Amino acid sequence: MKKHVLAMAVAASTVALSGMAQAEVKIGFLGGFTGPIETLTPPVYDAAQLAVQHVNEQGGLLDGQMIEMPTGDTTCSDASAASNAADRLVNSEHVTAIIGALCTGATIAAANNAAIPGGVVMVSPASTAPAVSDLADNDLVFRTVPSDAFQGEALARMLLAKGIDEVVVTYVNNDYGRGLADAFVATYEAEGGTVAENLAHEDNRADYRSELGTLSATGVPDLVVLAYGDTSGQTVVRQAYESGMFTQYIGADGMVISGLLDNVGEEVLNDSFIATRPGNPDTPGTERFVELAEAAGISHEAVFAGQGYDAAFLLALAIEQNGSAEREGVAPALRSVSSAPGEVILPGEWEKAKELIAAGTEINYEGASGSHEFDEKGDVPGVVEEMAVEDGKFVSKGFLDK
């Protein structure tokens, strides 16, 4: 074959047309509704829910079944919570597939302890650490976002292109932070940059002044913070600013969230914060998603929103292609519907896709966040976007070459 908040989410988890009696097909959603990415999760969930809405409004799955999307809170930082949430979806909710998780550690825990043993395909829209690629997953774990091996290289080259040739780095001590820091430092130093100090820090602490003191002792004014904007990342930046230690703050996707702006403030970040995040290239699929998201009143600009829509829509296409709500066969069907050649399907074009699949015509989904040609590890290529804070808002400064 070819290749917002937890309560709101739970209350809205059944997306079905009222009064319909068809059986439901369950696709679960695992996200960090509480914890260090609690402001990042709702827009991703909303985008996935929008994809489910499009499927349900245009005939549903298979013989008219509606998709139901039960949720699970991984907390992002607690492997036990992630495992338990995934176990409930796999063994109690009996989902056919899972969107998520979002944080890398949560995805790995959920996969190893529930999804892989249960034969359930997971598609993460946000787990970026290289460690996901190394899972012994029986071809069950995919992602619609590029690996941090890609983003770390792009961030390093972005700084060097700006003439920032010496930095200090602090990263959150988990799979996400370590993977991103390793990729960044390796490329930055290999291409002529100097990392004067590189320190891990633990998440969810109230005080990082000791680490900041060590970093500032180098005399380097440019601080790279590879962490979460809802927890350690915002505290590190705020305390660095209060002490006058640094003049430039640099981050990655975990920092490009509303919690950083809300809790640190534009007076600190305006014209002094730059970052990278996975971006959505200018394609017919991404343009279509902007229209659909705006019509639905959700943010198309939120980090990982496009990837969340694609994870949900791709899983629906795979189930339709597979011809049943059984778990077996979803993975090869996912590879089939996501890759060329085939009749192009854009976001929202469920009715068209359903008719083509029924006719035995090959399809190729071109998504909200770009093309998703999964490699042998379930990874996708992608683009990285430069971000900055201007007038109290995150703004895109364009796409970066790797």
Label for each model-derived stretch:
Residues L17-A23:
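Sec/Tat signal peptide C-region and signal peptidase I cleavage site
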Residues K2-V10, A23-K402:
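Extracytosolic ligand-binding ectodomains
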